[in-house]
Amino acid sequence: MSSSPSPGAAKSPYVRRALRGAVACALIASIAIAACLIWGGPKPLPPLRSIGDPFKDVRFDGMPALRFFTARDGTQLAYRRYDTADMGHGKGSVMLVHGSSANSNSVHPLAQSFLEAGYTVYAFDIRGHGKSGVKGQVSYLGQLDDDLEDFVNAVQPARPRTLLGFSSGGGFALRVAGSPRGVQFDYFLFMAPYIHYKAMTNRSGASSAWAAMGIPRLVSLILLNRVGVRNFNDLPVLNFAVTESPKADLVRQYSYALALSFQPPDDYRTVIRSISRPAEVIAGGEDELFFADKYRPLLDEAGRSDIPVTIVPETGHINLTLSSAGRAAAVAAIQRLDNRFDHRN
């Protein structure tokens, strides 16, 4: 008398087939991700003159020497302090965050304008730029947030404190403003801030002339980070259209970790809604990288009609921080914030 096969035995060929299919899919996915990591990086770009040329006529007279503070990982990070015996006292402090690939030199004219208006000014070499750490690199996602907190704790800038960011630095300032760490500051000023590549303010064609993104590598790293694999976060995902001038000391590439740390998260609308301190936005009417007239509807869409937007006419992206009109608009914005909210008590 023959025995019939057990249900488990009958199903075993299907189980084995499913397992083989799963292994094959995993192998194919692994090969695809590996290929994207190796060959899916950003392409090189020729220098973008509209970004580099405005600095040719900038004078750096009176730029203070670099100082350093120690971050929690022991790294010495650079900044400049603008302060004299008869200026820069009594009105609080302004902390300047430069744009992508740049350093504290790039905001020198803006720093001078705030010093002349009576503020103590701090200009950062954000980690991964200038003389702060390894160019184009941070050690982990979110390290820039930790660095800023370490700076405030170490230096104790005078209150009221304003965090001002320009371009990518404006996106970083926005990131801080909408986080629990925003309470370290009294005001925020975002100058032509980079919000997100999907934001309505982004000129996709113009922005791609300045920064080339390695999409295949970026997507692969996002997927790997979702499953806890962070071993490859030091790979470059952005190339910038910078000049080769040693004097400029610019950063050509950003790693995945730095690129994501120096901008708002994907849910930027929630970040905007979460800003708990007074803030303003300034943009140049002729900005080549971002749509200046879209900042107002973007803020309104996020429910922040209370955040004013100032458009400086006939002013491009870089010239917003270099021209007398752009610098005057920035000083006026912080003076307005001072008049509306008194944090000196």
Give each language-model segment a name.
Residues 5-71, 75-83:
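An N-terminal hydrophobic leader/cap segment in hydrolases
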Residues 268, 277, 288-300:
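Short alpha-helix in the alpha/beta-hydrolase fold that links the catalytic acid
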